[in-house]
Swiss-Prot record:
Organism encoding this protein: Pseudomonas putida (strain ATCC 47054 / DSM 6125 / CFBP 8728 / NCIMB 11950 / KT2440)
HAMAP family with a match to the protein in the record: SHMT
The keyword Lipoprotein appears for this protein: no
The protein's name: Serine hydroxymethyltransferase 2
Upper taxonomic lineage: Bacteria, Pseudomonadati, Pseudomonadota, Gammaproteobacteria, Pseudomonadales
Domain of life: Bacteria
Record-level GO cellular component terms: cytosol
Length: 417
């Protein structure tokens, strides 16, 4: 029998110390990685609940194990809330991650060797959209589209490639593109060549839920997302679709038993909480602020003479090219890290450096907005970053910025009392 008094602190001091240090890092450092955010205590409570004990292969009302009557309630709540949130007729809340949701979509609708048309990783796409190092690029014939000289998707080029290669599926989505996707145009191109349209909205799902970014569900045959990032929930995946009995059946079979075994019901419970939070009026205000903050930061970099890819942002992220400054993303990342500002190095279009070094940085504002930053704080923060980028080896500037970061983080904590 387990005692409820047996805590990690009492049982595993070494592990607890690492966890405490990570908690301190999150409070004292400014988080600008576009794919990161802070979950609510309720989301974390669900992930640490007794639901982690329950195996539940199958779907609500149709399980391969007994004793699933209560996890059925949990999972159905998540399904119903996801459908309401995104205006979908179908939702599968079982994918363990966004990449696994994407893999399930391919498994459901494609055969090995089929042609897919997705955005190049080097131009802002995602590994799972056909990159050669990913299973999506190994199992399928992946054709890639990119951005033009203005940093925008060239839809005429997408259409030309679609007509030339006749893909079975067109993938719309990104990991580093700061503008709004034209889902209607993607739909028209897909219809022209008889392709499925698959939208991966992992980065902008929270914006979509709040109505501050176009909803792809009415246009796509299938939509996937992660449940963290802008959606601010647990790390996990989600598949959505309009009513189509054939596609729904294929998607369910592809997730289980095709790609996964038992679902993680404790994570699904956390997803249910996340969806409920996203249905509240204050979530829309939060997402509106996320975009305002990203635009405020981008404007400062442009004013200071830096190149923002595509000239600005209409969502939660933007890419900063450092080619003109002859600075590597790796070195810039390290210097900012010393000032307690967490970013990620990122390849930029026509990047002369390797993906392990890069010539750019990716910035995102979901996490800083969660802790209360508004435009004024974000502009000030962007100015501090510019000061460091002006001379990566100026330790005095780095030290001064670090003290400012610690002060503003203390003023605007992630988790209050």
């Amino acid at each position: 029998m387990f005692s409820r008094d047996l805590t990690i602190a009492k049982y595993d001091a070494e592990l607890f110390e690492a966890m405490q240090q990570e908690a301190l890092r999150q409070e004292e450092h400014i988080e600008l990685i576009a794919s990161e955010n802070y979950t609510s205590p309720a989301v974390m409570e669900a992930q640490g609940s007794v639901l982690t004990n329950k195996y539940a292969e199958g779907y609500p009302g149709k399980r391969y194990y007994g004793g699933c009557e209560y996890v059925d309630v949990v999972e159905q709540l998540a399904i119903d809330r996801a459908k309401e949130l995104f205006g979908a007729d179908y939702a599968n809340v079982q994918p363990h991650a966004g990449s696994q949701a994407n893999a399930a979509v391919y498994l459901a609708l494609l055969s090995a060797g089929d042609t897919i048309l997705g955005m190049s990783l080097a131009h802002g796409g995602h590994l799972t959209h056909g990159a050669s190092v990913s299973s999506s690029g190994k199992l399928y014939n992946a054709i890639q589209y990119g951005i033009d000289g203005n940093g925008l998707i060239d839809y005429d080029e997408v259409e030309r490639l679609a007509v030339e290669h006749k893909p079975k599926m067109i993938v719309a989505g990104f990991s580093a593109y700061s503008q709004v996707l034209d889902f209607a145009r993607f739909r028209a191109i897909a219809d022209k060549v008889g392709a499925y349209l698959f939208v991966d909205m992992a980065h902008v799902a929270g914006l979509v839920a709040a109505g501050v970014y176009p909803n792809p569900v009415p246009f796509a045959d299938v939509v996937t997302t992660t449940t963290h990032k802008t959606l601010r929930g647990p790390r996990g995946g989600l598949i959505l679709a309009r009513a189509n009995a054939d596609i729904e059946k294929k998607l369910n079979s592809a997730v289980f038993p095709g790609a996964q075994g038992g679902p993680l019901e404790h994570v699904i419970a956390a997803k249910a909480i996340c969806f409920k939070e996203a249905l509240q009026p204050e979530f829309k205000a939060y997402q509106q602020q996320v975009v305002k903050n990203a635009q405020a930061m981008a404007s400062v970099f442009i004013e200071r003479g830096f190149d923002v890819v595509s000239g600005g942002t209409q969502n939660h992220l933007f890419l900063l090219s450092l080619i003109k400054q002859e600075i590597s993303g790796k070195d810039a990342d390290a210097a900012l890290g010393k000032a307690f500002i967490t970013v990620n190095k990122n390849s930029v279009p026509n990047d002369p450096r390797s993906p392990f070094v890069t010539s750019g940085l990716r910035f995102g504002t979901p996490a800083v907005t969660t802790r209360g930053f508004k435009e004024a704080e974000c502009k000030e923060l962007a100015g501090w970053i510019c000061d460091i980028l002006a001379d990566l080896n100026n330790e005095a500037v780095i030290d001064a910025v670090r003290e400012k970061v610690k002060a503003i983080c203390k003023k605007l904590p992630v988790y209050g009392n």
